[in-house]
């Protein structure tokens, strides 16, 4: 009997994807370039139909036609290496799916190369981490629709489910799937940083104990902030260190890593003039965190504001922080979906924004209840320029802006850094400013570089001799 699908790359994510497929009734062939990971996976089996192969040719020959091969290998050169090894063994009509965090431009290059050989190629964004890979992730496939249809029965089967809906939908051509995952990760960066800043306010400004802060996050997770990241934050704050008995959060070094997808999101936005400021600021916050030694030295040298004895009403300010966090998250998601929309128009992808919001509701790291509202907004207004002007969010932001302004101002007056909350407020105020100060910038550009300018009262392009 032939296997219905093959998985190459048996690290944590690849092994769990293979087990997920096998648990859903698929006959799965698995292959890894080093046999130790293959052997480790086989030891985990509990009756699933999963067959190990130690030679790539045997692996390929075990697959039913058209062959479907799922790659879960490290992004970059390893993906190219695997594809080069596979090409001589595959036939026209076979399908390769890349489920790693590949850059969408690499995916487009590989798509073109394989298209010439008649081999289908899907760039498949996957979100959910190792648990999601096993139990059901959010899946974002991009490539030719007819190629997707060959793989869809398996992809929809292993995806997370929300009600009767699988968290998998055809995203668009070529690199659209990996692009969608890339921006998803940018939103994730911003969401995480905003939550960290809310935590900082509760702990440093209101000086609340960790258990109380955890309870606050648990309460927030019962309302409109309900999301995976809010849920795990409460759990993190309650976790004790086995070695010291102290809260684990207090013994974790405050230096944040990153794997590159957030940077890719920011770079793509910058290259195309898209103001994804909160996403980019969250990346810079990680970079600043990595300067631990410099920060430790600077705290003894750089002065902040004089400490003042303040008596902030706890319940009032907890609500301000909740409002600030919600508004910051809305602004971050608005930027991410604006980046989807503007890039979709730029590349001619026709991204299904309402469906993207729906598949983010389950399995993925940024799953949140208000994604239903985002989907409804794009369903009602498919050409919506920005989520900030969707009626539901317009009303919310009007009501919650006081909370965000209070929190940001308190941070400024006390010298506590809230980079993403501050940037969210600047973005909100900048987006609602009908006439900005960019006229002065354009005049400056024309003064020193003769870059010309447009006028508000007549058509055309103008230059002034400013020294006369």
UniProtKB/Swiss-Prot annotation:
Keywords: Gluconate utilization, NAD, Oxidoreductase. Gene3D superfamilies: 6-Phosphogluconate Dehydrogenase, domain 3, N-(1-d-carboxylethyl)-l-norvaline Dehydrogenase, domain 2, NAD(P)-binding Rossmann-like Domain. SMART domains: 6PGD. GO terms for molecular function: NADP binding; phosphogluconate dehydrogenase (decarboxylating) activity. It is an enzyme of class 1 (oxidoreductase). It catalyses: 6-phospho-D-gluconate + NAD(+) = D-ribulose 5-phosphate + CO2 + NADH. GO terms for cellular component: cytosol. The active site is at residues 181, 188. One of its GO terms (biological process) is organic acid catabolic process. PROSITE patterns: 6PGD (PS00461). NAD(+) binds at residues 9-14, 32-34, 73-75, 101. Disruption phenotype: Cells lacking this gene exhibit no detectable phenotype on glucose as the sole carbon source, and they grow normally on gluconate. Its EC number is 1.1.1.343. Pfam families: 6PGD, NAD_binding_2. It comes from the Bacteria. Substrate binds at residues 101, 127-129, 184-185, 189, 259, 286, 445, 451. PANTHER family: 6-PHOSPHOGLUCONATE DEHYDROGENASE. Homodimer. Belongs to the 6-phosphogluconate dehydrogenase family. This is 6-phosphogluconate dehydrogenase, NAD(+)-dependent, decarboxylating.
């Amino acid at each position: 009997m032939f296997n219905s699908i093959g998985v190459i790359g048996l690290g944590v994510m690849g092994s769990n994807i293979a087990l997920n497929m096998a648990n859903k009734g698929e006959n799965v062939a698995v292959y890894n370039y080093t046999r130790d990971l293959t052997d480790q996976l086989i030891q985990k089996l509990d009756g699933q139909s999963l067959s190990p192969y130690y030679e790539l040719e045997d692996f390929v020959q075990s697959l039913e036609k058209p062959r479907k091969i799922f790659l879960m290998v490290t992004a970059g050169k390893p993906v190219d290496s695997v594809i080069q090894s596979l090409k001589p063994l595959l036939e026209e009509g076979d399908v390769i799916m890349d489920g790693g965090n590949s850059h969408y431009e690499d995916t487009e290059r590989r798509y073109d190369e394989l298209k010439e050989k008649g081999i289908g190629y899907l760039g498949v964004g996957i979100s959910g981490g190792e648990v999601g890979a096993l139990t059901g992730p959010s899946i974002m496939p991009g490539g030719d629709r007819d190629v997707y249809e060959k793989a869809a029965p398996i992809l929809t089967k292993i995806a997370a489910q929300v009600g009767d809906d699988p968290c998998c939908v055809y995203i668009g051509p070529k690199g659209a799937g990996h692009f969608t995952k890339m921006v998803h990760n940018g939103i994730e960066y911003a969401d995480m940083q905003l939550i960290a800043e809310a935590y900082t306010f509760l702990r440093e400004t209101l000086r609340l104990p960790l258990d109380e802060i955890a309870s606050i996050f648990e309460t927030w997770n019962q309302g409109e902030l309900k999301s995976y990241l809010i849920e795990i934050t409460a759990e993190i704050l309650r976790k004790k260190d086995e070695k010291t008995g102290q809260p684990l959060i207090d013994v974790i070094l405050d230096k944040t890593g990153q794997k590159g997808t957030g940077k890719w999101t920011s770079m793509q936005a910058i290259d195309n003039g898209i103001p994804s400021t909160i996403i980019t600021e969250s990346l810079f916050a990680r970079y600043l965190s990595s300067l631990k030694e410099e920060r430790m030295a600077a705290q003894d040298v750089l002065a902040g504001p004089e400490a003042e004895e303040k008596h902030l009403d706890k319940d009032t300010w907890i609500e301000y922080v909740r409002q600030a966090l919600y508004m910051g998250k809305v602004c971050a998601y608005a930027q991410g979906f604006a980046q989807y929309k503007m890039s979709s128009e730029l590349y001619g992808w026709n991204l299904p924004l309402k469906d993207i919001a729906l598949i983010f509701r389950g399995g993925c790291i940024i799953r949140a209840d208000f994604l239903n509202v985002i989907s409804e907004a794009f369903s009602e207004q498919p050409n919506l320029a920005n989520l900030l002007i969707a009626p539901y969010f317009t009303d919310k932001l009007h009501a919650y802006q006081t909370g965000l302004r209070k929190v940001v101002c308190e941070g400024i007056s006390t010298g506590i850094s809230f980079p993403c909350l501050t940037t969210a407020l600047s973005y909100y105020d900048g987006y609602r400013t009908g006439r900005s100060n960019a006229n002065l910038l354009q005049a400056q550009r024309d003064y020193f570089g003769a870059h010309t300018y447009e006028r508000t009262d007549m058509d055309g392009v103008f230059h002034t001799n400013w020294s006369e």
